[in-house]
Regions:
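Alpha-helical structural motif
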Residues: 3-6, 10, 19, 38, ...
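Phosphate/anion-contacting hairpin/loop surfaces
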Residues: 71-169, 174-181, 189, 243
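Basic, nucleic-acid-binding surfaces and adjacent catalytic neighborhoods in DNA/RNA-processing proteins
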Residues: 22-42, 55, 60, 147-252
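Glycine-centered secondary-structure boundary/capping sites
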Residues: 20, 48, 131-134, 183
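Accessible peptide chain termini
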Residues: 1, 251-254
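Gly/Gly-Pro- and Ser/Thr-rich, intrinsically disordered tail segments characteristic of DNA damage-repair
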Residues: 1-117, 241
Length: 254
């Protein structure tokens, strides 16, 4: 599943390409991803909408429309967007076509159909946003507030970092990388992690995520950018999926 750096990479690509575009029409080949309303009302809502911006919240893509309204997309395992100048017969995993007034085509594809799309007259009405924890780059994510939350739990530190209600955007890849850089055992109880260690964890979280965003995310299996290119951060992973390989610090096999 795309994590924060992958979603941020996609969002930046879409925002750059789609800002100011207008959705002219839709073709829906499979309606499973539409989780609010029926395909007809989904299409009716979107047709004629001008895209003001594309932003990210946690692992979600937020399409903002002018003057109001928005669409929330969760790519989950295999969802992706691509842009094309030409219209060819739909591929086997293409689920929705968004025809743009410029003549370009925005394609939503999803091999496993776990991704979701939902529209709202106001993104303030998006209920899932209220369940999300702070963004890693926000001031609300800090060692003291994190310690308070960890002390309330009996869980291990890694599952806590994966909890989207505690911290938005992290997944297995980046939680593993952050804990490795901090020297914190992922099986350690969260409430046993000291304040000084949490200060380092906050810093390393931001550092790892920034590095991954600069490398356009991690492409291990399905992740592709809007231009279909892969990310590069998989070449810089220090611990994730490196079992049996020498540790980058000690040369002992992981």
């Amino acid at each position: 599943m795309p994590e924060l750096p992958e979603v941020e990479t996609i969002v930046r690509g879409l925002d750059r390409e789609l800002r100011g575009e207008t959705i002219d029409s839709l073709e829906i080949f499979r309606s499973d991803p539409i989780i609010q309303g029926d395909p007809e009302s989904f299409s009716e809502f979107l047709c004629g909408r001008k895209i003001k911006a594309v932003q990210r919240r946690a692992k979600f893509l937020l399409f903002h429309f002018e003057p109001v309204g928005g669409m929330v997309v969760h790519l989950r395992m295999t969802g992706k967007f691509t842009l094309t100048e030409t219209k060819e017969p739909p591929g086997p995993h293409e689920r929705i076509w968004f025809q743009l007034k410029s003549g370009r085509l925005l394609i939503y594809s999803d091999l496993r159909c776990f991704g979701t799309l939902e529209c709202h007259e106001s993104l303030d009405a998006w209920e899932d946003s209220k369940k999300l924890g702070p963004e890693p780059f926000s001031q609300d994510f800090n060692a003291k507030s994190l310690r308070k939350r960890l002390r309330e739990s009996h869980r291990e530190v890694k599952p806590l970092l994966l909890d989207q209600g505690l911290l938005a955007g992290l997944g297995n890849i980046y939680a593993s990388e952050v804990l490795f850089r901090c020297g914190i055992n992922p099986c350690r109880k969260g409430k046993r992690v000291k304040l000084k260690e949490l200060e380092k964890l906050v810093d390393e979280t931001r550092s790892v995520l920034n590095e991954a965003i600069e490398k356009n995310g991690t492409s291990i299996s399905d992740f592709r950018r809007v231009d279909e290119k892969t990310g590069e951060f998989q070449n810089f992973l220090r611990v994730y999926e490196r079992e049996g390989k020498p540790c980058v610090l000690s040369l002992i096999h992981i």
